[in-house]
Swiss-Prot record:
Gene Ontology CC: cytoplasm
InterPro entries xrefs: Aldolase_TIM, DHO_dehydrogenase, DHOD_1B, Dihydroorotate_DH_1, Dihydroorotate_DH_1_2, Dihydroorotate_DH_cat, Dihydroorotate_DH_CS, Dihydroorotate_DH_I
Reactions that this protein is recorded to catalyse: (S)-dihydroorotate + NAD(+) = orotate + NADH + H(+)
Name recorded for this polypeptide: Dihydroorotate dehydrogenase B (NAD(+)), catalytic subunit
Gene that this polypeptide is encoded by: pyrD
Chief location bin: cytoplasm
Organism: Geobacillus sp. (strain WCH70)
Subunit structure: Heterotetramer of 2 PyrK and 2 PyrD type B subunits.
Task of the protein: Catalyzes the conversion of dihydroorotate to orotate with NAD(+) as electron acceptor.
Amino acid sequence: MNRLAVELPGLSLKNPIMPASGCFGFGREYAQFYDLSKLGAIMIKATTKEPRFGNPTPRVAETPGGMLNAIGLQNPGLQKVLEEELPWLAQFDVPIIANVAGSTMEEYVEVAKHISKAPNVHALELNISCPNVKKGGIAFGTVPEIAAELTKLVKEVSEVPVYVKLSPNVTNIVEMAKAIEAAGADGLTMINTLLGMRIDVKTAKPILANRTGGLSGPAIKPIAIRMIYEVSQAVSIPIIGMGGIQSAEDVIEFFYAGASAVAIGTANFIDPFVCPNIIAELPVLLDELGIDHISECMGRSWKKGERSVYCGA
């Protein structure tokens, strides 16, 4: 019995570990370190219709508990991803989750329609943290009605299951999750980065050229755990959790909160072997915990007692 195997919509995972979109590119650099077939899945870099060169530099800044980034969805565009990146990834025995982004609903739909036809793409991850240029730049993922409409449109054209990536930069993430589930999403991935900023004390100017960026790394892990804990009790679709994972213990904590699989982001920059190392460490930890299969961990923190949501002091 494979104690780490996980079944999700569109995804038969040999283990629940995958690199998060944006922290792994298309895997070419990491393939120099280990066989990518060891991974449960690969979430590739966000793809837009046309190539994007991203934001001006500097666009990365370290923080005491992680990092800020304002890359700006730099990617080679849909055509190159279909013609070069996905065929290259086909040599590995690993399902691909294609991250879809855009500036308009029409762009999301077009990218989703074409990329979902690729033979090694088993699911889509809808990046709804992008600004909607037709609505004054407000992010798709901050208004439940807009997020739901986008989800529904993409579901209508996608040939594979659709997972929606939730932004933590909202007032009520449970309300957002429920709206997206009602619109037909097959699963959720959460959380995306939190908005943050750093200022140079010598120049009094923002360190990032974009001024603000997305905070990731260990600093956001408690927030991710809390949000997954709340959302997993409110929806029936599976959650792929992410946000500051660095160890096998972190993975189990995410499962206890309600995740069914996890994605590892910033830690890949610190240790390129972090994913295969965690995969190797998980069976040892399961033995220590007296757990036969990782699926037994899902939601254990709330399934044993009363469902609870923190409402403030």
